[in-house]
Amino acid sequence: MKLRLLVLAAALAASGAQHAQAAPRGFTVEDLVKMERVGSPLLSPDASKVVYTVRTTNMDKNRGNTQLWMLDLRAAKPAPVRLTQADASSTDPEWSPAGDAVYFLSARSGSNQVWRLPLSGGEAARVTDLPVDVENFRLSPQGDRLAMSLAVFRDCADLACSKARVEAQAKDKATGKVYDRLFVRHWDTWKDGRNNVLYSAPIDAAGKVSAAPVSLSGTIDGDVPSKPFGDHEEYQFSPDGKTVVFSARVAGKTEAWSTNFDLYSVPATGGAPRNLTAENPAWDTKAQFSPDGKTLAYTAMQRPTFEADRFHLVLMDVATGKKRALTGAWDRSVSDYRWAPDGKSLLATADDVGQHRLFSIDAASGKASAVSGLGYVSAFSVARDTVVMAQASLAAGAQLYKFKLGAPSKADKLTNVNEAALADVRFGEYEQFSFKGANGDTVYGHVMKPWNAQPGQKYPIAFLVHGGPQGSFGNSWSYRWNPQVYAGAGYATVFIDFHGSTGYGQAFTDSISGDWGGKPLEDLKKGMEAAAAKFPWLDRERSCALGASYGGYMMNWIEGNWSDGFKCIVNHDGVFDIRGMAYSTEEIWFTEWEYGGPYYKAVESHEKFNPVHHVAKWKTPMLVIQGDLDFRIPTAQALGTFTALQRQGVDSKLLVFPDENHWVLKPANSVQWHHTVLDWLNTYTRK
């Protein structure tokens, strides 16, 4: 397909004229699910171009579709060029070393394979044609080799064997599955015996992978990258292309209660992996070589089995293996990071007091300095002296911005996705506030006005409680829990980063473990009252509480321990019985850390804040929602909640999605979810 410049001037002018005449309106869930989603910016090696993804939503097909776009940054006003167009998505872009082609993943041929699109024109050509799907990949710095993850049976001699076994399983009339160790299921998928195995293969003169891929991690009983959310950030080529470093957890019988990921080094052509971090029993991951190849950076935790421990940056001398903690004194947890091209600093994102900022970290001293302002930086890329980042806020989905290293205050906006479609939408105004919470600590939260707020008026409250529990409900844009949907429906919203939230120092994050119903509930109570006192447009007498996951747990806890707090409650995938949760969730390292061990060794701590003991006090109307593919907080928890409500005659409804997991992701289901929730709120706050 020839590259085509998207020419929309006339259409946008007409659209702008129509929107100029349209009356302002509130934001709706239909707006939310139809929004185009910008992500994965990647600068070309010479920083002259950036390729990125845009996901659109087809409501008729009830699914999203992701394609690649490009901006030429040399232009005075860069215009978006669409690179790919197919019924199948195109994702995971990688630049060729010369910047003359883009590699990407697509299932346009029927299976997920690597493709190459020359920027000089012409159609995309398939680089791999393997019997199994390519899950993710990296291109070597020289462009002559791929590292890629494939889902295979480790005891198979070749890829064809794995394909044949999957096909045989599908045809087998007997459907029973036999397990002799955990995991038996993970997130939303039953285990079928396959592992993510890292392979390497050369690219021949014709631009194809013609030789059989060589396993790099197959001798390790584990997944590379990790399941369920790992990606190519968990493995990396060295600058000379001769070595691959990857992160893996040896599974064995302890996989379900271990977070001991180690870094392994292996020749890119195959060989025995060498453990680089055997001394650390906690999590080591996301290795990246410095530009000169002499230093290996990676993120590491210190406490085994604690998934919310602080990720700090470690630098390892490649020649000697000597390590030093770079950000040990910085009380923030590193999310994503990249080396600056000169090797003197690293760029990293981290939660920070209700924001998710981009920081520059000095490679010698470890000093961190913020280079982005308010908002949420979801992705970024750096090449030469240029940085491109995707940044969102509570008032807008992600857009791309460009700035020069050393001059972050002069960021240029590169994209205007969704702005024409939402030109007549008036978003709710929001503000961060603080108050004295549990232990007299400063706690932060946000409030948001309805889109049509008027002076002197009061508005019902949607009180949103985040999950995690080690997370943050800050200045970001969500396609699942978005306060603007409630603002668009006439509600004020209040959301608190209670004790246990991230971005306020590790001690604050740690403080929730073993205290799920203690300090967090106190913070929520004090935060609600502080907000009501500070913002007179909040109608405290007409409020409903909503939460998912840990937030759903908190809905059950509020039901029995703050029973006069709200007119109604919405509980999505929430914990009802902590004992049942401990024995049925899949990642049991989580519950064992939070409660000090397995249930049979720590009964008292599990039961201390167990909602099931307080159901006799339940009286607030509750909407219970559950995804039946949620193996993190299984369906039995929602059924227990609903049964307790119904048996006592408490007004209640149960909404179940048979085809959703812990999150509601399908567009039509998201619309149904929001309309059901808003109807529930309207029933009890509009009386």
How would you label these PLM feature ranges?
Residues 47-50, 102, 146, 244, ...:
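Hydrophobic beta-strand positions that form the internal "hydrophobic ladder"
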Residues 456-467:
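Short beta-strand element of the alpha/beta-hydrolase
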Residues 42, 147-149, 175-180, 184-203, ...:
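Non-catalytic accessory segments flanking enzyme active sites
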Residues 73-76, 118-122, 203-207, 267-271, ...:
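Short loop/turn segments that connect beta-strands within beta-propeller blades
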Residues 482, 487-488, 495-687:
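Active-site-proximal cap/loop segments of hydrolase catalytic domains
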Residues 45-46, 97-98, 141-142, 239-240, ...:
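Residue-level detector of Asp-centered blade-edge/turn motifs that repeat once per structural unit
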Residues 54-67, 83-91, 105-115, 123, ...:
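A flexible loop/linker signature enriched in serine peptidases of the S9 family
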